[in-house]
Protein backbone atom coordinates (compact mmCIF):
# COMPACT_ATOMS: atom_id res chain seq x y z
CA UNK A 1 0.00 0.00 0.00
CA UNK A 2 2.04 2.89 -1.21
CA UNK A 3 -0.60 5.56 -0.77
CA UNK A 4 -0.72 8.54 1.45
CA UNK A 5 -0.27 7.88 5.17
CA UNK A 6 -3.75 9.31 5.74
CA UNK A 7 -5.25 6.54 3.62
CA UNK A 8 -3.19 3.94 5.48
CA UNK A 9 -4.55 5.16 8.80
CA UNK A 10 -8.07 5.27 7.34
CA UNK A 11 -7.84 1.66 6.17
CA UNK A 12 -6.54 0.45 9.55
CA UNK A 13 -9.29 2.34 11.41
CA UNK A 14 -11.94 0.88 9.09
CA UNK A 15 -10.64 -2.66 9.64
CA UNK A 16 -10.46 -2.29 13.42
CA UNK A 17 -13.98 -0.83 13.42
CA UNK A 18 -15.20 -3.84 11.43
CA UNK A 19 -13.74 -6.17 14.04
CA UNK A 20 -15.41 -4.22 16.84
CA UNK A 21 -18.74 -4.23 14.99
CA UNK A 22 -18.57 -8.01 14.53
CA UNK A 23 -17.74 -8.71 18.19
CA UNK A 24 -21.33 -9.64 19.21
CA UNK A 25 -21.22 -12.51 16.69
CA UNK A 26 -18.16 -13.92 18.44
CA UNK A 27 -19.71 -13.64 21.90
CA UNK A 28 -22.99 -15.13 20.64
CA UNK A 29 -25.07 -12.35 22.12
CA UNK A 30 -28.21 -10.82 20.60
CA UNK A 31 -27.63 -7.70 18.53
CA UNK A 32 -29.74 -5.34 16.39
CA UNK A 33 -30.40 -6.36 12.81
CA UNK A 34 -28.84 -3.15 11.41
CA UNK A 35 -25.53 -4.15 12.98
CA UNK A 36 -25.12 -6.90 10.38
CA UNK A 37 -24.50 -4.20 7.78
CA UNK A 38 -21.55 -2.63 9.59
CA UNK A 39 -18.71 -5.21 9.21
CA UNK A 40 -19.21 -5.82 5.46
CA UNK A 41 -19.54 -2.11 4.72
CA UNK A 42 -16.41 -1.25 6.69
CA UNK A 43 -14.32 -4.06 5.18
CA UNK A 44 -15.61 -3.23 1.68
CA UNK A 45 -14.81 0.47 2.13
CA UNK A 46 -11.28 -0.33 3.25
CA UNK A 47 -10.85 -2.75 0.35
CA UNK A 48 -12.05 -0.18 -2.18
CA UNK A 49 -9.63 2.40 -0.77
CA UNK A 50 -6.78 -0.11 -1.16
CA UNK A 51 -7.86 -1.05 -4.67
CA UNK A 52 -8.05 2.58 -5.70
CA UNK A 53 -4.63 3.61 -4.38
CA UNK A 54 -1.62 3.53 -6.68
CA UNK A 55 0.52 1.74 -7.79
CA UNK A 56 -1.83 -1.10 -8.64
CA UNK A 57 -5.29 0.51 -9.00
CA UNK A 58 -6.93 -2.88 -9.54
CA UNK A 59 -10.51 -1.62 -9.88
CA UNK A 60 -10.58 -2.61 -13.56
CA UNK A 61 -9.28 -6.16 -13.16
CA UNK A 62 -11.96 -8.68 -14.22
CA UNK A 63 -10.19 -11.53 -12.40
CA UNK A 64 -10.54 -9.67 -9.11
CA UNK A 65 -14.25 -9.08 -9.60
CA UNK A 66 -14.83 -12.68 -10.74
CA UNK A 67 -13.21 -14.00 -7.57
CA UNK A 68 -15.24 -11.51 -5.52
CA UNK A 69 -18.46 -12.65 -7.20
CA UNK A 70 -17.70 -16.31 -6.43
CA UNK A 71 -16.96 -15.37 -2.82
CA UNK A 72 -20.24 -13.45 -2.57
CA UNK A 73 -22.17 -16.49 -3.82
CA UNK A 74 -20.39 -18.72 -1.29
CA UNK A 75 -21.14 -16.16 1.42
CA UNK A 76 -24.81 -16.18 0.43
CA UNK A 77 -24.88 -19.97 0.73
CA UNK A 78 -23.22 -19.75 4.14
CA UNK A 79 -25.71 -17.10 5.25
CA UNK A 80 -28.58 -19.33 4.17
CA UNK A 81 -27.26 -22.19 6.31
CA UNK A 82 -26.66 -20.24 9.54
CA UNK A 83 -29.19 -20.89 12.27
CA UNK A 84 -30.77 -17.80 13.72
CA UNK A 85 -33.31 -16.71 16.24
CA UNK A 86 -35.06 -13.36 15.76
CA UNK A 87 -36.99 -11.13 18.12
CA UNK A 88 -39.22 -9.40 15.57
CA UNK A 89 -40.50 -6.85 18.10
CA UNK A 90 -37.11 -5.38 18.92
CA UNK A 91 -35.35 -6.28 15.65
CA UNK A 92 -32.63 -8.22 17.48
CA UNK A 93 -31.18 -11.51 16.34
CA UNK A 94 -28.97 -14.26 17.61
CA UNK A 95 -26.79 -16.32 15.29
CA UNK A 96 -25.89 -19.95 15.99
CA UNK A 97 -22.41 -21.18 15.12
CA UNK A 98 -21.57 -18.10 13.09
CA UNK A 99 -18.33 -16.73 14.47
CA UNK A 100 -16.66 -16.29 11.09
CA UNK A 101 -17.84 -12.68 10.75
CA UNK A 102 -15.48 -11.58 13.51
CA UNK A 103 -12.62 -13.75 12.28
CA UNK A 104 -12.98 -12.47 8.72
CA UNK A 105 -12.62 -8.93 10.05
CA UNK A 106 -9.54 -9.96 12.05
CA UNK A 107 -7.90 -11.68 9.06
CA UNK A 108 -8.65 -8.65 6.88
CA UNK A 109 -7.05 -6.36 9.47
CA UNK A 110 -3.99 -8.62 9.64
CA UNK A 111 -3.68 -8.57 5.85
CA UNK A 112 -3.76 -4.77 5.87
CA UNK A 113 -1.20 -4.59 8.68
CA UNK A 114 1.02 -7.07 6.84
CA UNK A 115 0.82 -4.94 3.73
CA UNK A 116 1.63 -1.80 5.72
CA UNK A 117 4.57 -3.37 7.54
CA UNK A 118 6.02 -5.16 4.53
CA UNK A 119 6.55 -2.00 2.53
CA UNK A 120 9.02 -0.19 4.85
CA UNK A 121 10.94 -3.40 5.58
CA UNK A 122 11.95 -3.88 2.00
CA UNK A 123 10.69 -4.01 -1.53
CA UNK A 124 8.26 -6.90 -1.41
CA UNK A 125 6.94 -6.30 -4.88
CA UNK A 126 3.59 -5.65 -6.45
CA UNK A 127 2.61 -9.32 -6.31
CA UNK A 128 2.31 -9.22 -2.50
CA UNK A 129 0.11 -6.11 -2.64
CA UNK A 130 -2.04 -7.69 -5.33
CA UNK A 131 -2.41 -10.85 -3.24
CA UNK A 132 -3.49 -8.75 -0.25
CA UNK A 133 -5.99 -6.85 -2.40
CA UNK A 134 -7.38 -10.08 -3.82
CA UNK A 135 -7.68 -11.57 -0.34
CA UNK A 136 -9.47 -8.50 0.96
CA UNK A 137 -11.86 -8.47 -2.00
CA UNK A 138 -12.69 -12.14 -1.40
CA UNK A 139 -13.21 -11.64 2.35
CA UNK A 140 -15.33 -8.51 1.87
CA UNK A 141 -17.50 -10.17 -0.79
CA UNK A 142 -18.01 -13.29 1.31
CA UNK A 143 -19.06 -11.16 4.27
CA UNK A 144 -21.41 -9.07 2.14
CA UNK A 145 -23.11 -12.17 0.71
CA UNK A 146 -23.33 -13.87 4.10
CA UNK A 147 -24.81 -10.92 5.96
CA UNK A 148 -27.20 -10.02 3.15
CA UNK A 149 -28.60 -13.56 3.22
CA UNK A 150 -28.96 -13.40 7.02
CA UNK A 151 -30.79 -10.06 6.89
CA UNK A 152 -33.18 -11.30 4.20
CA UNK A 153 -33.84 -14.51 6.11
CA UNK A 154 -34.34 -12.69 9.41
CA UNK A 155 -37.29 -10.73 8.02
CA UNK A 156 -39.27 -13.95 7.49
CA UNK A 157 -38.06 -15.93 10.50
CA UNK A 158 -40.75 -16.55 13.13
CA UNK A 159 -40.59 -14.49 16.31
CA UNK A 160 -38.61 -15.80 19.25
CA UNK A 161 -38.03 -13.97 22.53
CA UNK A 162 -34.41 -12.97 23.10
Segments (PLM) and residue ranges:
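Cytoplasmic-side transmembrane-helix entry/capping segments in multi-pass membrane proteins
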Residues: 30-44, 63-69, 92-102
Amino acid sequence: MSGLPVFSVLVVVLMLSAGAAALPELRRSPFPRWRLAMPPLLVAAATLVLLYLPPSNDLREPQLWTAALVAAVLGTVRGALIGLQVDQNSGRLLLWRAREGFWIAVVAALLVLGDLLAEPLGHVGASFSQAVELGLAILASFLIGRNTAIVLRSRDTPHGDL
